[in-house]
């Protein structure tokens, strides 16, 4: 079997390392941070394994003016940043047609159809019983108008067998009585579940990997080097040789890809969360709020309100206005929320078509990419790891990943 390096110890990299190690490969995982403590740490905790609708919608054009100038909406844009990154923005908008939205939904559906099964394989080896909650998410709409504006997304989900049920105000109140009844109706995403600690999920998979002879080196990788058909990782003043290398470094992946001649239109959607004290067990299900694009999820450490999108790159500091909007809106929906325990911002890796990059480099044989999962990193981590394992072993994946290939741009 091969000597493999996996760069990136978020949920994608850890799941990939798990499958490769389990199949007999000698695997070393690299990250400059502790496993699971970066982007994977801060998500809303949903296993949205059947989600196929992304931000690339033909209806975005109609709503764009309002979205762009609404500082209390689900999308906030730093105009200076966007103007300096116009090629990415133009590519994104080109993917906001009916034909492209259909293609993206079909591609995600084909890839995610075995996401749950891939996680089951991991969870057969890793005890996460206390971290998985089988309560279906509820997504709430403030008004009939807002609900009707989302019919296109509902129809697309129906086409690709995403199961959901529309429930009325009275039904919502029975399920989650602590919610202020300021909603019009809601949608229950059937068959989905969530984790009460994304960090613990990643750490438990990582600990199992280490327990079974996996290796972890906490260090920043500077570059990938190819010499005489051999592959090396360069860090500090050292080089380490490997047979195969997997780049699963999230939004930082392109920095490594460039060192071997690849270049991807990878950018970031900055996401935020606030954790509130949950003294009275206010929620039993994840509850989404369509108007602001966040979920309120009951977790071990409190109620985490996570989501929103800010287009502002990697360098700008945390936007306190985003946090203020999240807190104000969350308290309006759930008035009994306790004190703020913590605030967080992370960087979702995003490509213009909202699809991940999964496949082998053409510039450098035996280098594989697994990044760009934007809002679905937790949901698609296990199936991504499974597919990368199959690609490395030259096995049939039984999943059509043509739309995810690294050279589609």
Question: How should each PLM-predicted stretch be described?
Answer:
Residues 3-28:
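N-terminal Rossmann-like FAD-binding beta1-loop-alpha1 element of flavoenzymes
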Residues 22-41:
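Glycine-rich FAD pyrophosphate-binding loop
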Residues 45-47, 51, 55-95, 223-226, ...:
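Active-site substrate-recognition segment that forms the wall
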Residues 86-204:
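Rossmann-like flavin
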Residues 140-144, 158, 170-175, 268-269, ...:
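Flavin (FAD/FMN) cofactor-binding core of flavoprotein oxidoreductases
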Residues 167-171, 175, 217-231:
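A conserved short coil-to-beta-strand element within the FAD-binding core of flavoproteins
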């Amino acid at each position: 079997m091969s000597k493999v390096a996996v760069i990136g110890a978020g949920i994608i990299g850890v799941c990939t390392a798990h499958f490769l190690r389990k199949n007999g490969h000698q695997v070393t995982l690299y990250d400059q941070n502790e496993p699971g403590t970066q982007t994977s740490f801060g998500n809303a905790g949903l296993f949205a394994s059947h989600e196929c609708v992304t931000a690339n919608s033909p209806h975005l054009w109609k709503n764009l003016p309002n979205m762009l100038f609404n500082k209390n909406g689900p999308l906030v844009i730093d105009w200076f940043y966007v103007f300096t990154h116009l090629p990415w923005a133009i590519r994104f908008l080109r993917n906001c047609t009916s034909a492209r939205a259909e293609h993206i939904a079909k591609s995600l559906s084909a890839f995610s159809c075995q996401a749950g099964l891939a996680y089951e394989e991991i969870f057969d080896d890793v005890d996460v019983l206390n971290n998985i909650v089988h309560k279906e998410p509820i997504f709430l709409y403030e008004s009939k108008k807002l609900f009707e504006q989302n019919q296109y997304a509902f129809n697309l989900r129906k086409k690709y067998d995403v199961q959901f049920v529309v429930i009325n105000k009275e039904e919502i109140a029975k399920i989650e009585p602590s919610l202020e009844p300021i909603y019009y109706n809601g949608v229950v995403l059937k068959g989905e579940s969530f984790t009460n600690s994304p960090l613990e999920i990643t750490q438990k998979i990582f600990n199992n990997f280490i327990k079974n002879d996996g290796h972890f080196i906490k260090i920043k990788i500077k570059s990938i080097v190819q010499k005489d058909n051999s592959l090396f990782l360069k860090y500090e003043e050292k080089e380490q040789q490997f047979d195969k290398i997997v780049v699963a470094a999230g939004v930082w992946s392109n920095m490594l890809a460039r060192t071997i001649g690849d270049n991807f239109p990878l950018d970031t959607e900055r996401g935020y969360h606030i954790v509130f004290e949950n003294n009275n067990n206010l929620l039993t299900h994840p509850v989404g709020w369509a108007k602001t694009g966040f979920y309120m999820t009951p977790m071990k450490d409190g109620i985490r309100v996570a989501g929103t999108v800010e287009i502002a790159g990697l360098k700008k500091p945390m936007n306190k206005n985003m946090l203020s909007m999240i807190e104000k809106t969350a308290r309006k929906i759930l008035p009994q929320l306790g004190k703020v325990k913590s605030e967080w911002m992370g960087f979702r890796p995003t490509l213009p078509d909202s699809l991940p990059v999964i496949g082998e480099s053409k510039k450098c044989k035996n280098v594989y990419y697994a990044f760009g999962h934007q809002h679905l990193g937790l949901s698609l981590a296990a199936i991504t790891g499974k597919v990368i394992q199959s690609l490395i072993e030259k096995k049939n994946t039984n999943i059509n990943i043509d739309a995810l290939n690294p050279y589609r741009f």
